[in-house]
C-alpha cells in the first residue's frame, strides 16, 4: 500500500522532514517514489514551515495512497492557512 509520510532529514537538534510517497513496507528514510513537500518544525523568522505540492498530493490520494496521522494533520493545517490567506 502506498503511504504519504514524513522522512527525517536535517542535522543534530535541527529536524527537517520531507513529505514522501512510499510503500508502507519501506523504512522511514528508505527509498520513495516521489517527494511532494517538506516540513520544518523548528522554522524561525522568515523560514517556511510547511510546503506542499497540492497537485501531486491530490493525484496520489486519487490513486489510493493513504496519509499517516501526522501528514493528515499537516495537510489540514496547510488548507486552513491557505484559506485564511
Curated annotation (Swiss-Prot):
SUPFAM superfamilies: Ribosomal protein S16 (SSF54565)
Keyword Ribonucleoprotein found: yes
Keywords linked to the UniProt accession: Ribonucleoprotein, Ribosomal protein
Record bears the keyword Ribonucleoprotein: yes
A Gene Ontology cellular-component term: small ribosomal subunit
InterPro entries on file: Ribosomal_bS16, Ribosomal_bS16_dom_sf
GO biological process: translation
GO molecular function: structural constituent of ribosome
PANTHER family linked: 30S RIBOSOMAL PROTEIN S16 (PTHR12919), SMALL RIBOSOMAL SUBUNIT PROTEIN BS16M (PTHR12919:SF20)
Record family assignment: Belongs to the bacterial ribosomal protein bS16 family.
Official protein name in the record: Small ribosomal subunit protein bS16
Organism: Pseudomonas syringae pv. tomato (strain ATCC BAA-871 / DC3000)
Biological classification of the source: Bacteria, Pseudomonadati, Pseudomonadota, Gammaproteobacteria, Pseudomonadales
